[in-house]
C-alpha cells in the first residue's frame, strides 16, 4: 500500500513550514510507504494579507499536484487500496482524483484536513464570497469526495455541519443525528493536528528571562479583534505591545519573542485550531 501525501504549500512563518517535513516523517515512522506530491517552489512566497497562503500562488501549487496525480495514474503507479492524504481539504484536485479513481476502476482511500472555507463566517471565503452557490456546492462536493474529513475541534465540526451541510437552517430535527452518524462511520474525524514537533521546537525558549512584553501573535484579520489590543496598549504604557505580523519576523525571531513575553493576548471571536495559543502555552 502506498500513501500519497498532497501537501500544503509551506510558508516559513506559519506551521505549514514545519509540516513540510514533519508530516511525511510521522507517516514513515508509522511504517507507511510515503510519496509526497508538492507543487513548484517558485510561487509567490508572501501570503495574502491576513491569510495563511497566497490566493494566486496556491492555485499554481495545487494545479501542479493535480498534474502529478494524473501522471501517477497514467504510469500505473497507483494501486487499488492506496491512500491519498490532502493536508488542505479545500483542494479542487480531490475531484480530479475521484474522477480518475472511479473511471479507471482503481479504488483509493481519500483523507482531507479541513482548515476553513465559506461555511466559516470569519474566513476570507466566508466574508468575501459567503454562501454563493458555486462555493457552497464546491465545498459539499469536496466533503463528499473524501472518505474521511478531519477537523481539529468539535467546534469546527459543528460549524461546518450546521452552516454547510445543514445550509444554516435554524431548525432541523435530524441535524444532530446526521452528524452523529457521520462521526460514527468516519466521515467526520475529530483529531489533533500533527504538531508533535512543537515540544522539541519550543523547548530552547522555555526558560528565557521574561520582560514587560505582551504579544499579539495572530493573523491580522477581523475576527482577531486587533483594535482591542491596540486600545489596551494606550492604557498600559508600562508594557511593550507587539503585533507580530507587523514585524516581518522569522520563525526563530517569533519564538524568541514568545520566550521573552509575559503574556500572549487573544480576543479572538473563534478558534478552529488556535496555533498561536498552542505556541504561547
Could you say what each language-model-derived stretch is?
Residues 1-96:
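N-terminal pre-catalytic "stem/leader" segment of glycosyltransferase-like enzymes
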Residues 188-224, 230-234:
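Conserved donor-binding/catalytic core segment of Leloir-type glycosyltransferases
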Amino acid at each position: 500500500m502506498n500513501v500519497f501525501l498532497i501537501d500544503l504549500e509551506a510558508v516559513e512563518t506559519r506551521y505549514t513550514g514545519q509540516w513540510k517535513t514533519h508530516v511525511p516523517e510521522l507517516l514513515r515512522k508509522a511504517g507507511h510507504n510515503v510519496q509526497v506530491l508538492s507543487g513548484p517552489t517558485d510561487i509567490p512566497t508572501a501570503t495574502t494579507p491576513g491569510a495563511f497562503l497566497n490566493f494566486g500562488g496556491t492555485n499554481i501549487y495545487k494545479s501542479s499536484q493535480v498534474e502529478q496525480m494524473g501522471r501517477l495514474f497514467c504510469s500505473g503507479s497507483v494501486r487499488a487500496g492506496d491512500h491519498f492524504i490532502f493536508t488542505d481539504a479545500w483542494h479542487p484536485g480531490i475531484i480530479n482524483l475521484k474522477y480518475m479513481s472511479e473511471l479507471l476502476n482503481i479504488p483509493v482511500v481519500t483523507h482531507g484536513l479541513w482548515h476553513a472555507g465559506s461555511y466559516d463566517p470569519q474566513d476570507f471565503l466566508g466574508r468575501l464570497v459567503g454562501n454563493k452557490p458555486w462555493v457552497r456546492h464546491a465545498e459539499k462536493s469536496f466533503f463528499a469526495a473524501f472518505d474521511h474529513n478531519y477537523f481539529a475541534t468539535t467546534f469546527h465540526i459543528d460549524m461546518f455541519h450546521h452552516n454547510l451541510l445543514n445550509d444554516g437552517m435554524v431548525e432541523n430535527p435530524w441535524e444532530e443525528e446526521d452528524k452523529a452518524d457521520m462521526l460514527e462511520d468516519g466521515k467526520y474525524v475529530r483529531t489533533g493536528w500533527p504538531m508533535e514537533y512543537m515540544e522539541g521546537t519550543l523547548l530552547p525558549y522555555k526558560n528565557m528571562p521574561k520582560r514587560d512584553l505582551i504579544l499579539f501573535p495572530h493573523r491580522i484579520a477581523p475576527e482577531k479583534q486587533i483594535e482591542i489590543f491596540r486600545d489596551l496598549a494606550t492604557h498600559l504604557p508600562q508594557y511593550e505591545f507587539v503585533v507580530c505580523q507587523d514585524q516581518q519576523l522569522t520563525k526563530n525571531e517569533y519564538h524568541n519573542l514568545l520566550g521573552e513575553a509575559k503574556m500572549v493576548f487573544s480576543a479572538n471571536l473563534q478558534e478552529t485550531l488556535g496555533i498561536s495559543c498552542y505556541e504561547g502555552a
